[in-house]
């Protein structure tokens, strides 16, 4: 995947092999973002993926509308409101970003190298976004930065431009090994960052590479040993190479970027990140950490990764609405048994739109994807259990489509810039307001962007609206006339009964839905004991709730009792 990487004789000695550390928590949690390759078939798929990626990335820059400045904007706001202060427990001291900037919002006034400026012009960028204007100058000056910005704000360019300039000024060559590492929570976001970096480095001689779970590890190791100057990585695969790939030179590391730090920690990579930071050299390393939210865990990660006195940059005033201005948001209240019928009716009426539907689990995505395609409502599906080849192809197919429906888990909720999305449908409710904000952030991206979102809630889940209100998220209530909802319940039930594979898939989806529901953090809102399992089962095409084995701790017994009681009714 790295373009222009050439094998050279290295004068440096090989770094000492680090002792392999076992992940004691690895067997306890499932990670959708980094499954390992085990079969020959998948190995072949990934070799094919490697050869195809460069072709796919030719269009990536066009997909990243969040990084494109508004060329029609005639007047730039000169001041933002006072940035939010981090808690007393955070790194001390934090230096607040100066409200005044260089006085110009143009890239050409940053004093960048000729190859970088040529690439920026080739990509069609002229003016900086707020986060770029406030972040790039201090990073070019060598400061460590902790940044907070809304999704779609253009932070990818904000950290890549200084990183590439550093490699250029130090005249990095393949034999010097890796000088910059960018850590990303998901494969798709890593691929997207790789695409932007590839375009930015088009006129540079430095080398670029990517290591992600699900890709061919041997090919990755070969490229690392030849010398990758700027490396994009997901946490698990990066730690694997740091510990086990002999000939991977990282002793000359000059910059570490941690993107979407809160998401990295949320999906269970806290231990890996601590090990990565411990392994990497820190003496002359500049670090950049970006996070949409400043949690205690993010502050802990900042403490061990950033040097003393980092610059804190927040371009989101505390009183500002948390979602994009051009986003029209609403919710609909319906009982569990009507949820799928309403979704089907909505999708059928908006078949010419570009829509993303979020569900709570891989098996739910798999089932509803199979069901909708079976009943002639074409959809794409994206989830963490798919092979990397499938995930990548689906991602680019939906990005390039003018209309279509993508059913997915939260693997697509953070950071991905998918152009011209008309609707975001949250069929299964988000875990908290942060997840809601990142889901709806897939539409109305960039300055002047427009989009709509719709969230499905049952009557017992309406308490979630209080949390959204507290997070400055404005919602309208939508109503759908019952006579406009397609009544296909009897046909659905007959189909599930008569089709063995759909029946099994429906059963797996039903089980996964209950497990996901029981794992919600907001227990006062999402109370599994209040679910009407007969109605929930109907939404999956069952007359009565199927008997399923679910491991959800203390709630398991009460659910099984409820199953038995409601099957008798």
From Swiss-Prot:
Ranges spanned by the short sequence motif DEAD box, renumbered to the chain: 259-262
GO annotation, biological process: maturation of LSU-rRNA from tricistronic rRNA transcript (SSU-rRNA, 5.8S rRNA, LSU-rRNA); maturation of SSU-rRNA from tricistronic rRNA transcript (SSU-rRNA, 5.8S rRNA, LSU-rRNA); snoRNA release from pre-rRNA
Location of region: Disordered: 1-57, 71-110
Main location as per UniProt: nucleus
Superkingdom as given in the UniProt entry: Eukaryota
Positions that bind ATP: 149-156
Record bears the keyword Phosphoprotein: no
InterPro entries recorded: DDX18/Has1_DEADc, DEAD/DEAH_box_helicase_dom, Helicase_ATP-bd, Helicase_C-like, P-loop_NTPase, RNA-helicase_DEAD-box_CS, RNA_helicase_DEAD_Q_motif, SPB4-like_CTE
Compartment(s) of residence: Nucleus, Nucleolus
Motif extent (Q motif): 105-133
GO MF annotations in UniProt: ATP binding; ATP hydrolysis activity; identical protein binding; RNA binding; RNA helicase activity
Helicase ATP-binding domain boundaries: 136-312
EC nos: 3.6.4.13
Signal peptide: none
Catalytic activities: ATP + H2O = ADP + phosphate + H(+)
Domain Helicase C-terminal span(s) in chain numbering: 326-496
SUPFAM superfamilies, alphabetized: P-loop containing nucleoside triphosphate hydrolases
Acidic residues bias (residue ranges): 34-45
Cellular component terms (Gene Ontology): nuclear envelope; nucleolus; preribosome, large subunit precursor; small-subunit processome
Keywords linked to the UniProt accession: ATP-binding, Helicase, Hydrolase, Nucleotide-binding, Nucleus, Ribosome biogenesis, RNA-binding, rRNA processing
Biased composition (Basic and acidic residues): 71-85
Family: Belongs to the DEAD box helicase family. DDX18/HAS1 subfamily.
Function: ATP-dependent RNA helicase involved in 40S ribosomal subunit biogenesis. Required for the processing and cleavage of 35S pre-rRNA at sites A0, A1, and A2, leading to mature 18S rRNA.
Subunit organization: Associates in the nucleolus with the 60S and pre-60S ribosomal subunits.
UniProt comment concerning the protein's domains: The Q motif is unique to and characteristic of the DEAD box family of RNA helicases and controls ATP binding and hydrolysis.
Name this protein carries in UniProt: ATP-dependent RNA helicase HAS1
Gene giving rise to this polypeptide: HAS1
